[in-house]
Amino acid sequence: MLRTIATKIFGSRNERILRRLNKIVKKINALEPSFEALSDDELKAKTDEFRQRLANGETLEQLMPEAFATVREASRRILGMRHFDVQLVGGMVLTNRNIAEMRTGEGKTLTATLPCYLNALTGKGVHVVTVNDYLARRDAETNRPLFEFLGMSVAVNVPGLDPEVKRDAYKADITYATNSELGFDYLRDNLAHSAQERFQRPLHYALVDEVDSILIDEARTPLIISGPAADSSELYIAINKLIPSLVEQEKEDSDEFQGSGDYSLDLKNKQANLTERGLEKCENWLVEQGLMRPEDSLYSASNLGLFHHISAALRAHTLFQRDVDYVVKDGEIVIVDEHTGRTMAGRRWSDGLHQAIEAKEGVKIQGENQTVASITYQNFFRLYEKLAGMTGTADTEAFEFQQIYGLETVVIPTNRPMIRDDKTDIMFENEQYKFDAIIEDIKDCIARHQPVLVGTASIEKSELLSAALDKAGIAHNVLNAKFHAQEAEIIANAGYPGAVTIATNMAGRGTDIVLGGNWKAEVAKLESPTEEQIEAIKVAWQQRHDEVMQAGGLHIIGTERHESRRIDNQLRGRSGRQGDPGSSRFYLSLDDALMRIYLNEGKLNMMRKMFTTAGEAMESKLLAKVIASAQAKVEAHNFDGRKNLLQYDDVANDQRHAIYEQRNVLLDNDDISETIDAIREDVFNSVIDEYIPPQSLEEQWKIPELEERLRTDFTLDLPVRQWLEDDNQLHEDTLRERIIDAAKAEYQRKEELAGSESMRSFEKGIMLQTLDELWKEHLSAMDYLRQGIHLRGYAQKDPKQEYKKESFQMFTEMLDALKLSVIRTLSRVRVRTQEEIEEAERQYQAAMAAQQQARQAPLPNAPASSEPTQGSELSPEEKVARVAAERHIGRNEPCPCGSGKKYKYCHGSRAKDHA
C-alpha cells in the first residue's frame, strides 16, 4: 500500500532512471548543431581527443555526452541514420552494468554503436556478443563504415578462423563474436602450451545482444572441450533392445502408491526413474545377455557403468522425441534448440544420452568424450569487468538478472507509441478444435490480405499444422529446423499481403519482418540492377506496404503458451514494430504441454466441465489467471534450477580460476626453477613424514621403507641407515635436511649435464603437461561427485555443503598429486648429454603442436540446453612417444597410452618387436 502511494508520488525506479538520463539527452541534443558544423577530419579527430582526455584523468561518464554526439553525427553522415533520443537513452543504459529492454524494431543494432564506441576508447577491447555467426557478420558489416570513419578497428570472430586471424580479431577495438566462440576461445587459451598461443586479452566489456537468450536460456549450458574416451557403442546397441520391453507407470512408487510398471517419468525435470520391478527386470535381462554376473546388483560399484547406460537409454526412448528435441539429418542426430527451434550442428548431449539416442534411431554411434576443460555461460560472462545486454524481452526476468549477474533492467520507451492489438487468449477442449479455429482465423486474414505469422512450440507441431493447412488448401511457408537454409528468404516474404508463415518458437529472431515484404532482398536477387529496376521494386513494395497497413499489419497467432512469458512476448514482438499496426492472439487447448505438465488433474477436470458443446471456445479472466499461475510456476522452477546449478558450479569455478591463474603464471614465465625448488622441498618433506613421523621416537622410524621409496620414486640411492649408524648426532631435522640436500645435488648434477636453458624449458613443459592431465581427471571426478551428491540428503546432510567439503578435499589431493608427479618425473628423467635433452624437448614440442592443431580445428557453432564439445587429444602412440622421450618407462608401469595394460604387454611389447 505504502509502496504504491510512494510510486504514484515519486514514480517507479525505471521512471526515475529515465528522467535522469533524459537530462543528458538534452545536453547531447544541445551539442548537435556544433558537431554538424565540424568537417569530416575534425569529427574523426574527436576519437584521439577523447583518448587523450581519458589518459589525463577524465572518466567515460564525463566524456559520454560528447562521445555520443560524435557517434550520432558520424552515423548520420556515413550510415544515413540519426540516433533517436530513445536510442541515446538505450546507449547510456548499456554503458554500464545494465540491461536495456528495447522493443523489436527499435534499432538495437544502431543503439549498440554508442556504448561500443565509448568503451572502446579505453583501448581494452569491446566484445559485441550475438547468438549466431550470421548476426555477428551482419552487424559488424553494418557498423564497420561508421567505426572505421571514427578510427576504430572492427573484426568478426566466428568458428573456423585461422589462429593468426583470430588473434588479430581480439586485438581489434570492437570484436563481433558468438557467445559460444568467446567461451571456447577462453577455454582454448587455458589449454595453450605457450603464451604466444593465447587469443584473448583480459575480458573488459561485453555487450550481449538477445541477452535473455544467452544469460537465461543458455545459462545452464556448459561449454566443453573434450577428448575421446573408451568406445562402448556395442553396449549402447545391446541395451537399446531392452528398453521397449519396459512398461511405464503413472507415478513414482511411494508409501501411498505402489505401481505395477517398470519406470515412471518426471516431465518437469526430464528424468526417468526405474521402479524396483523395473530394476529387477533389467538385472535379469543383463544376466541373460551375459553382461552381468547372477550374484551382482546394478547398484554395485562394478556395474554403475551398466546402470548409467540403462538410464541414458530410458531417457532417450521416453523423454526425447524425434522432430521435437532433435532431427535425424545425414545419418546424424542433430539437436534442436528448444528456445529458438534452430538445429545446432556439432552439439552433443553429455552423459551418454546422445549415444543412446543414436542407438535408438539406428544411426552410427559416435564415441563418448572425456572433459578436458569446461565452463558455463553464467560463469564465463561474469568474468568480464563490465557486462551489459539488450533484448526486447527482459523485464519478466529482471529479478534473475539482478540476483545472478548484478545487472539492472531498464525498460526503454518506444520511439513511436505501440498500437498493436493483443487480443484475449482463447481456450479449446482439445487440439483438433484449436487447429480448426486457427485455420478459420488464417482464412479471415487471407481474405483481408493481412499477413500471418503462426508460432508453434516444436517441429512436430509445425508439421501437424502445416498438414492441416495443406488439407484446407491454404498456401504457406514453414520455418523450422528442417528448413533452416531458407530462413532468410521465408522471413523476407513473411510480410507480403496474405502471406502465411509457420515458425517454430523464435526461428528468425534478430531479423525484422517488413510489412509488404523486403524490397532490399528483391534487389539483392538481381545480378546488376539498374536504377529503373530498383525504383520499380520500391514502387511495388510501397503499394504492398500500404495494403498490409490498411489490413491491420502483421497478425501473430500463438498455437500454445510457452513455459515462459518471455518467449510469448518475443513472438508477439514480431508485430507492431516502430509504431506499425498489428495484432496477436494465442489459441490454447487442454492438450497443451503447459496445461498437462503444470496443472494438476483436479484443475484440468474442472476446466473440461466448462466446455458444454463440441468446438466451444472459452475466454475469461479465470483462464488468464490459470495460465499466469502455470507460467509463474515454471519460471520459478527454472530459476531455482539455474540458481541451484550456479551454487554448485561456483565451487568448480573457484577451483578453475585458481588453476587457470596458476597456469597463466607458468606460461608467462620462462624460469620456474624457484617454484620447482619449493615444490621439491614440500614433496620430500611429505614423503619423509610418512616414514619418520614428526617428533617420533627413532624406534618408530621406517628407514628401509624410506630408502626403497626414495630409490623407486626419485632414483635416489641414499644410505640412510648407514648415515644413522655413522653419526650419533643425526636427528630428525638434520636427517631430513641431508636427504633434501642430496636430492637437490642430484638434480643440480643433471642440470649441469643438460644445460640450464634446456632444463628450464623441460621443467615448464612437465609442469604444464602434468597440471592439464590431473585437472582433466579432477573434472571427471567432480562430475561423478556432482551426480551422486543429492543422495546425501537421505542421510540428513546438506548436499551443497557436502559437495563443497568433498570437492575442496579432492582439489587439495589433486594439488598434492601434482607436486609429487612433477618432482617424481623430474627426478627420474635420464639426462646424459645436451643433445639428448634437446631431442626430448623437440619431441615434446612436436606433440604439443599436434595437440594445439587439434584444438584449433573448426568448432561447432551455437548454444543450447546441451553441451557443446571440442576434441583435443593425442593418439596413444604420440602419448607413449612423448613420455619415452622424457624418461625411461618401467616394464611393469601402466602404459602411457591409457589402455590400462602394463607397458610390457602393450606398447612395450611393440617396441620390442620393432627393435
Swiss-Prot record:
Cofactors (names): Zn(2+)
A Pfam family that the UniProt record links to this protein: SecA_DEAD
Binding positions (Zn(2+)): 895, 897, 906-907
PROSITE patterns (UniProt xref): SECA, SECA_MOTOR_DEAD
GO cellular component, one term: plasma membrane
Gene3D superfamilies: Helical scaffold and wing domains of SecA (1.10.3060.10), P-loop containing nucleotide triphosphate hydrolases (3.40.50.300), SecA, preprotein cross-linking domain (3.90.1440.10)
Protein name, per record: Protein translocase subunit SecA
Organism, scientific name: Actinobacillus succinogenes (strain ATCC 55618 / DSM 22257 / CCUG 43843 / 130Z)
